[in-house]
Amino acid sequence: DDLVFFFVGIVILYLFVLAVASHFKRIVYPKAEKKYHCAILVPEESPLPVIYREESYEFFTYNDLHQGINTLDREHYQLVLILSNTAISLSPLFLEKIYNAYDAGIQAIQLHTVIENRKGFCNRFRAICKEIKNSLFRAGNTQFGLSSNLSGTNMAIDLGWLQNNLRSSKTNIERKLFQKNVYIDYLPDAIVYCQSSPVHPYRRRLRKTASYFFPSLLEGNWNFCNRIVQHLIPSPLKMCIFVSV
């Protein structure tokens, strides 16, 4: 019992440090010196989200993500933005903030997902859990120079990198980025408003995820090690139930 509570205490301390760090001042990227073009991908039969008037973007719908990305011309588009099927609108100056980060050398960006529908206990609880994860595992991580977690949707990634590394629609983009040690930033001011909580596109395979820990540790890939640890931490609901018991 003492050992269990010791590990629980370590986890709580770890999460507390991330929570405090998430409120520190963030880096503001300077205005992009170049003009970029962005391809915005949304699933077929999904409504196109409302976007404030901005230049240099085009909407595309896709049924197969791998096929959709590989049909894009990398000579014309530098960035690809993958949105969830529940996205309804984007915040003002949305693309400008993404372009500023990309111009500074950031190849992968997790955007801030905000759930609009909060009617009822379940929807409100999902929205709260989403914001907790945003604060801890995205904003908190980046304050320590570690990569943000990637949700699999509502993200912006360098098109050339995606076309070179996305082998199929089942490829786990987040895992591939961590394995290649590509830094993932989080932009809390680039907001994607969603009608409901987006579905995570990857299966949660704890055993397979844990198997990457020691190889990543030996390689000194601290970003991936940190992500694996966070992947193994129970959800906020399970943590609350365990602590209350």
Language-model segment annotations:
Residues 1, 5, 24-32, 144-145, ...:
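Basic/Trp-rich segment in TM-proximal cytosolic loops or flexible interdomain/linker regions
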Residues 68-79:
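Active-site nucleotide-sugar/metal-binding loop of Leloir-type enzymes
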Residues 75, 98-166, 203, 207:
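Long helical/loop segments within the catalytic core of UDP-sugar-dependent glycosyltransferases
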Residues 77-89:
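Short beta-strand-to-loop acidic/aromatic patch adjacent to the donor-nucleotide binding site
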Residues 91-95:
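Acidic donor-diphosphate engagement hotspot in glycosyltransferases and nucleotidyltransferases
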Residues 108, 116, 156, 168, ...:
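Conserved active-site beta-strand element of glycosyltransferases/polysaccharide synthases
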Residues 161-188, 200:
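A short, conserved alpha-helix in the catalytic core of glycosyltransferases
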